[in-house]
Each structure stands twice: as C-alpha cells, then as structure tokens.
Amino acid sequence: MAVLQMQKLTICAMKKDRKAVLELLQKMGTVECIPDLEGTEVFKRMDTTSQRMQFEKNFSLAEQALEVLDQYDPVKTSLFASLAGKELIEADDLTHVVEQVGAIMTKVRELLNLQRRVSDARSLIQKKEAAIEGLKPWAALDVPMKCQGTAHTALLYGTLGPEYTQTLIDNALHERLPEVKAVTAEILSADKDQVCLAVVCMKKDAAAVEEALRAEGFARRLSVSERTPAERMAKREKEIREIESEISGLEEQMRAMASLREDFRRVSDYFRIRSEKYKVLGDLIQSKQTFIISGYILKRDAGPTVDRLNSRFDLM
C-alpha cells in the first residue's frame, strides 16, 4: 500500500467569503479540517452544537424513512450494487431540496408516524393473542367467571398443580371435608403446568372448601367480565381481524409513498452535508472580519487547491 505524503494547510480569508470558501472546500473534498487552532480574545470559536444536533436528527429521520420504504417497497438492485456506494447528489438536486425541505420533512414524519401506528397495532395484536392463550384453558366454562354462584351455591375457579387428576381432587376434598357432601370439582383443562378447575358447593361451605383446596395448592382465579371465556376469546379474535385490516391499510399508504424515495434520499444528503458544514464552522476560529481554518491535505493536491482558492477569494 502506497504511503501518500500529507501537508498541513491553514487558510485565512474574509468572513464575507466564509460560506463560499467552506462550500468549495466541501465540494472539492481534498482538505480534512481539524480543530487545532486555539481561540483568542480576537479570534473565537463558534458553538454550533445545537444546529448540528438538529441537522443530525433530521438526517436520522430521513434515513429511517428510507429504511421503511425499503421494507415495504424494496428497490430491486444487482448483487454488486451495495459495493458502488451512495450515488452523489447533484447541485441542482440540492437546490430543489432547499426549496422543498419543509414539505419533504413533513412527508418523512408522516411516513414514520404510519410505521409507528403499524408497530403499535402489532404490539396490540400480541397482547390480545396472549390474552386468548390465557383464556384457552377456561374455554370449556359456560358461565362468565364473574359469576360466583347463586343465592344458595358458590362457584370457585382456580388452578392446581399439573399432577392432580380428577380422582386425586375428589379424594382430597373427601379426606379434608368428610362432613361436606354437596361439593363437586370439574377439571376444565390440564397441561404440563397446571390443572384448571371449577368447584361448586353450597354457599355456607364455600370458605371451608376454598381452605381445603388451598391446602392442596389451589390458586383462585377472579374476573370481572360479564362474558364467558369463549365469548371473550371470540371478541379478541374479532378485534385482531379488525386491527390486521387497519395494518393492511396503513401499509398500503406507506407503499404509496415510495414515489418520494428520491426526495427522502436528497433531504438525507442535504442534512448530512449541513451537519458536516456546521462541524467545520465549529472547528474554525473567527474575528469580526476574518476567519481561519486549518487542516491536512495530500501534498499532490495542495497546489491545485490553493490555486483554486486564490483564484476566487482574497486569502491572507
């Protein structure tokens, strides 16, 4: 690998030419500016942090919007397209961006808002699916779990360990409550984690029955819903279908914004360039009339760069 000789370059010019000098340096791309100059009472450094942060934020938003478009409306490219790097933006395109930056960023935020709504909707679907999974073990129950019995009977819903069978439950109740005859336990479902059951007894015996079951590890399940578990599952499934339909509509709106891809790419480049420019502005020192900037340049590029600058500006 060849080692190319570098040379330090310091430029002092009139402040009225600052914008044009910096834009020319940025366009040529031959000078790497560095913040090695010390400020004085006359020459001071400008704080450009807040401006740069805003430019970088907008750049990030535009890049996110491009990623969303690539997700919902990918551009077909060749296998080696990624090796070509980013396409250079033309000066005329930048002029268009400057004129339309507000409108383009409005569309960027609109697209990202659509994506957030899709993300929120999918999270809501996951919650409803989890709720359905939680209700499945109780699907065989044909009364709302809010129902705690009648005027004379009590209904208890809850879970026991997975090792319990119908016989074990009946035997446990008989052994712990020999004096209670009117008590029936029904297993609604069983899996490797738990047994779900419903227990019916006389209301006067409810406290004793629950205490006996708790001694076996019973965990009571309470609910305030007026619907049966099956009805609650059906309601959530309907809500999921409605949300999925909403997501489809939102995704269609995002795909319809694919025509703005080039505008998003240009506005991304615009804010990247602005951020880089304001970084250089923060690195240079300036007085009321002049500014000084320092950096490194390839020795072979130094002469042509200096000649080009001198031909356009009054350098000191």
Residue locations for each model-derived region?
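Long, charged N-terminal accessory/stalk domains
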Residues: M1-M316
